[in-house]
């Protein structure tokens, strides 16, 4: 029986439990552990193999495959160590999905935008800067801008800047001057990742891709009075049937970042967009064309399951069964 490791951080997480259940149903022997419990012994005193990878009682190098539900948060060196372990397990012959490179590609919003654009995929206009002067210039150019943490999740700490007012995703309009807030953010982060705000129908799309195929999608609708569509920020979900164009860019986005499974967030533009009104020579069809906001390399499958009854964990384990 093939040994499948499942790296989790929350035993009660819906997706973690779904992966464990699906692994058993596919005939695997799932070994569940937290990467924050991992330890490695290298070199002197070890005969064969040269290194020993363990997490609790799980001998990681004995695994046939490893599904990463979550790497976990923490201090820089600790998180880096976990990614090193994943890379080293790959070198030891363990099939790791998603690969550490793919997870890092998706987790870094700036680098993900670069890779998506390089692959010819549509993304909002994006500028990364390291000074207050440059940030103010970009915000003025966009008119309506969004500042996101490069390493962020669940819609937290996203700020919208419009008419010299700044509003974070979980707060009301900030009373402090924009310059003061931006300067503080620069001091904390060292750079700012700024995107044009895309006027939209009050929703975005989360498409779930497994093995290069879009298996389902949901609309995520912002809560009343909010501009952030994340479910964790109070948004709601509904069924979404992808257009051919949306399906194609979702699948290509997963490929561009190297993910085996991913949540692809897509925004639909509207013809009435202020940004689009200022864009000369752009057709109505192009004004409403979809753009990729970001890619999640460790996505939850609960939203798709609740809306459609489609269980991404079943698809992930079926994919794994076919490659082992």
From Swiss-Prot:
Keyword Flavoprotein in record: no
ATP-grasp domain mapped to chain residues: 113-321
Stretches for region Disordered: 268-295
Residues forming coiled coils: none
Catalytic activity of the protein: 5,6,7,8-tetrahydromethanopterin + L-glutamate + ATP = 5,6,7,8-tetrahydrosarcinapterin + ADP + phosphate + H(+)
One Pfam family recorded for the sequence: RimK
EC class name: ligase
Binding site residues for Mg(2+) 1: 265, 294
Keyword Cytoplasm in annotation: no
Binding locations of Mn(2+) 2: 294, 296
Any GO CC annotation of this UniProt entry: cytoplasm
Family assignment from sequence similarity: Belongs to the RimK family. MptN subfamily.
PANTHER family per the UniProt record, alphabetical: BETA-CITRYLGLUTAMATE SYNTHASE B-RELATED, RIBOSOMAL PROTEIN S6 MODIFICATION PROTEIN
Protein name, UniProt field: Tetrahydromethanopterin:alpha-L-glutamate ligase
Source organism (scientific name): Methanosarcina mazei (strain ATCC BAA-159 / DSM 3647 / Goe1 / Go1 / JCM 11833 / OCM 88)
Taxonomy of the source species: Archaea, Methanobacteriati, Methanobacteriota, Stenosarchaea group, Methanomicrobia
Gene for this chain: mptN
